[in-house]
Structure formats: structure tokens, C-alpha cells
């Protein structure tokens, strides 16, 4: 999202069991409407435009996913989810659902699989049938709320809807389950990279946050407000409400858990 070229790390042969189910899309170009300034005979990206260009890149990348749905039928459900979000389908009835849009209310975790961030409810995975899908960026931007039928503004809005099903206990969002070094690399290249760079967070600072089980990013701050001004403590929880895969592989991934001693 920062515009830096990245090598292709995905090797489909590492997932031979699911090879027939994977459609691997590679984006070769950038959107045409990025904002650059001219300096002599060359173009450069001004600091004031980095954020908006980053948003344009990620939206362009999201919408590329539509190319992977050529074989999907109009009645098939399409799910949009970040790769660190794991939807829980136990409480979702595919056959009985009549709602236009489905949202999964998920628990948010940081650094370790069981370090729970209880300050916000995370509406991660969203879904609709293919016949309703305008674009993946549209689905992602739909407001995480079921609006009452008397809200007339929903008739004209592309983000506010009344025909919404919210799935309680809808899964898990595992954010920054990485080493401090990898967290730094991700944040320097992610959607919020300009703000992260402005905050001046170095590797030592990130390592300290992980050690103290602290999140210093304010998810509730307004979009234009500075978001690195507060600290929030994570809670260590038991394995009871974790995904079955993690329960069954607790020893294998023990370094990515942090239980209270």
C-alpha cells in the first residue's frame, strides 16, 4: 500500500491439499488516479498525498478480487475477510439466511492468540450473495450496523443498510501475530504507513509494547485525529473460546500464546 514493489511469496504447492480451491490473483499495475507532483522530469509522491494514495491502492487491490468469481453463481455467498480474520460459521445458517448483508462480530487479539483487546467490537468478515455484490471495496465499507427501517437515508446510501444479519460470536481477528521486527515491517508498508512513520515508532518501542501487552493505537479515534497518544492493556484469556484448530495445536504454537502465570 506504500507503493513499494514486493516479491511474490505465495507458493501454491505449499497448499497442495487445497490447490483446487485456490484462485491466485496477481496485481501487476497501480490505479490510474494516484496523485503525484512533478519535480523536473520526474514525478514524486508528496507526504500530503501518501495517505490518500495508500487508500486508492488498497481499494484497487480489493476490487481485483472480483476476477476470481467467474465461476461463482448468483446465489453463492461471497465473503470478504482479511487474512488475519477467522469467521466462525457455527452460528450462521447458509440455507435459512434471507438477509442481503451478513456481518460477523469478532473478538480482537494482539501479538498472541490469546491476548484479548476488549475495548472494541470488531466487525471483520462481511458477506453477501454474488448477485448483490457491487464490489469488494463496497462490501468492506458497508457500515457495521443494522439500521432501523424508518431510517430513510438508507434508501439512498451505499453504506447504510437495514437488511443486515449480525452474527454474534462470529469469530476472531488475530492482529499483529508476528515478531516485533515483522510488525514494524508490516506497519511501514500498510494502509496507515504514513501515520506510523510520523509517530516515530522504532523497533525498540514495538518490542516494549509486546512485552508489556500494550496496544498504543486508538481504534476509536476519529479518522483525522492522532491515534498513537494512548495505551490500552491487553487481557490474557484461556483457550476455551479459541478456534478448534488452535486448541488441537496448542503445543505446536505455544510461543504464540501468553497465559497468566
Identify the residue ranges that each predicted region occupies.
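Long amphipathic alpha-helical scaffold regions
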Residues: 1-2, 112
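Active-site-proximal specificity loops/subdomain of glycosyltransferases
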Residues: 2-80, 89
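Generic alpha-helical propensity signal that fires on short helical segments
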Residues: 4-10, 36, 40-45, 120-122, ...
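Compositionally biased, low-structure terminal segments
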Residues: 11, 16-19, 93, 137, ...
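Serine/threonine-rich low-complexity intrinsically disordered regions
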Residues: 11-16, 31, 42, 93, ...
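Sequence-level detector for tyrosine residue identity
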Residues: 24, 36, 60, 80, ...
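Conserved catalytic core of nucleotide-sugar-dependent glycosyltransferases
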Residues: 54-55, 85-201
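C-terminal accessory extensions appended to soluble enzyme cores
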Residues: 162-261
Amino acid at each position: 500500500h506504500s507503493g513499494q514493489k514486493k516479491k511474490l511469496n505465495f507458493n501454491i504447492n505449499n497448499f497442495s491439499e487445497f490447490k483446487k480451491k485456490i484462485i491466485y490473483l496477481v496485481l501487476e499495475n497501480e490505479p490510474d488516479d494516484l496523485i503525484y507532483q512533478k519535480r523536473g522530469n520526474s514525478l514524486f509522491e508528496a507526504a500530503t498525498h501518501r495517505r490518500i494514495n495508500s487508500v486508492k491502492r488498497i481499494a484497487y487491490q480489493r476490487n481485483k478480487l472480483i476476477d476470481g468469481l467467474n465461476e461463482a453463481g448468483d446465489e453463492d455467498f461471497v465473503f470478504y475477510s482479511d487474512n488475519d480474520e477467522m469467521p466462525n460459521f457455527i452460528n450462521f445458517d447458509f440455507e435459512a439466511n434471507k438477509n442481503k448483508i451478513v456481518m460477523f462480530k469478532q473478538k480482537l487479539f494482539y501479538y498472541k492468540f490469546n491476548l484479548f483487546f476488549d475495548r472494541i467490537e470488531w466487525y471483520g468478515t462481511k458477506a453477501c450473495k454474488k448477485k448483490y455484490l457491487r464490489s469488494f471495496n463496497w462490501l468492506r465499507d458497508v457500515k457495521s450496523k443494522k439500521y432501523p427501517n424508518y431510517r430513510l437515508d438508507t434508501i439512498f446510501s451505499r453504506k447504510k443498510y437495514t437488511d443486515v444479519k449480525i452474527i454474534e460470536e462470529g469469530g476472531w481477528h488475530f492482529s499483529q501475530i508476528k515478531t516485533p521486527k515483522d510488525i514494524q515491517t508490516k506497519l511501514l508498508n500498510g494502509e496507515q504507513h504514513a501515520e506510523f512513520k510520523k509517530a516515530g515508532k522504532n523497533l525498540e518501542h514495538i518490542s516494549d509494547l509486546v512485552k508489556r501487552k500494550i496496544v498504543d493505537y486508538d481504534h476509536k479515534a476519529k479518522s483525522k485525529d492522532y491515534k498513537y497518544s494512548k495505551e490500552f492493556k491487553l487481557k490474557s484469556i484461556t483457550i476455551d473460546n479459541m478456534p478448534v484448530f488452535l486448541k488441537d495445536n496448542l503445543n505446536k504454537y505455544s510461543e504464540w500464546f501468553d497465559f497468566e502465570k
